[in-house]
Amino acid sequence: MGALVVLALLALTGCTATGDRQMDDRDLAVLCSNDAEVCRAWAGAFTERTGYGVTTVRLPTSEALERIRHGEDLPEFDVWHGGGSEMYVEAADEGLLAPYRSAQAAGIPEDFRDPEDRWSGVYSSMLAFCVAPQAISDLGTDIPRTWDDLLDPALDGQISTASPRTSGTAYTAMSLQIDRLGEDAGREYLAGLYGQVLQFTRSGTAPAQVVARGETAVAITFAPYCEAARAAGSHVEVVLPEDATSYEIGAVAMLADAPHPGTAREYLDFALSADGQRAGAASGIDQIPTRSDLPGNLADVLADGRYPVIGASLAERSSRRDALLAWYTEEVER
């Protein structure tokens, strides 16, 4: 589907912050890799702040990267907002992102942004299980508390997760198993885990809704998506794995050859600011801020040791992605 058709459809379905007026030469096209409501909240807050319109196309992180790769000859988007920074590292290495040193970057620790200013981390979430306690009870088993608990035969066909080929969330979970167990044992574990999955979703935000609808008993997702489903009335609970977990650093970047670079820089200033990092919470999905001047920020969360976080460096997680996805395609999807 061509870009103009996609943008027109999104305007008809309300995934836009331009209202009824026509887009002008200051308006932005944003590729967004977060929950749809978060994307709308970000766009709406920027429009309210600046008066510029924002048209949003939402795609899972890995699909968004492929869209950017194939759009070099006819740039569609100004900004990419949301999704794990592993994919932003790849995009930066391929020359797909434009460097921009925002004054707001000073509020974000260096560990959470690119040293060459090609992307900045603006939120985070912890990897978790989203469980339906009644469904677990009906299966005659216990609520899973560790990764190995997900291999319980009672949970065969009762797990929802996204495909790591399309979802940054799912790739975070995949990479964690290699960190936890090593290359060979990690792949062996993943083969067993994926054998328990009812159906792979495209987006990492979707599995929590699969559990909320009663289609499975457990989802692998980031905690805020499960918390939002619970707040909306679903009988689900967040379980942080006791043996190990990981987290995402959700990023934002201006794309190389952005059609509206001036407005794109203003959008990055907003996204990195305290107001920008708080804006997503209006959607009901409360993610961890990266700014050190905001309460409950990522650096403080990691320092207090409340979660059993392990994991390789961002560069290492990014470098092994192609090999892991090739294994997944050959061993799981075939």
Language model regions located:
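Extracytoplasmic ligand-binding site segments that recognize negatively charged/polar headgroups
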Residues: 33-40, 75-215
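A ligand-binding cleft/hinge motif common to bilobed small-molecule-binding domains
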Residues: 86-90, 212, 216-235, 284
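Periplasmic-binding protein-like
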Residues: 125, 189-194, 200-201, 232-258, ...
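An extracytoplasmic/periplasmic, membrane-proximal ligand-sensing/linker region
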Residues: 184-185, 290-334
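A bilobed periplasmic-binding-protein/Venus flytrap-type ligand-binding module shared by bacterial periplasmic
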Residues: 130-135, 175, 248-263, 279-280
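C-terminal motif of bacterial Sec signal peptides marking the signal peptidase cleavage site
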Residues: 11-14
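Early extracytoplasmic/lumenal segment of secretory-pathway proteins
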Residues: 16-90
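Mature extracytoplasmic/periplasmic domains
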Residues: 255-309
